[in-house]
Amino acid sequence: MASITAEEIEFATDLFSDLGDLTTRRMMGGLCLYHQGTIFAMVHSDYGVMIKGEGAFKEELDAMGLWHWTYTREKTGTSSSMPYWKLPDSALDDPQEACDLARRALAHL
């Protein structure tokens, strides 16, 4: 896994800038994005920009057909999932759509 680039960080912070009170922190092989101290999205070098899903919002993300981050543990072979779904391509090109999804995510966190 490669590190995320300065360009990827700038892209993500610009994409969600309309939320205001946005902070970031490097972790989990990427960059976590926070609004008013609550993590709502992350940027992963391998998977791109992902939105956090909790509660009923998880079902909405699945219904949208978005890719859900899962992984297999090498040692045990068991699969696990993280509470993150890849943003749709349309949201990557539309900050309003991205921020709408972020607000929906935050409402369930």
What label would you give each PLM region?
Residues 1-109:
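Charge-dense, helix-prone N-terminal extensions
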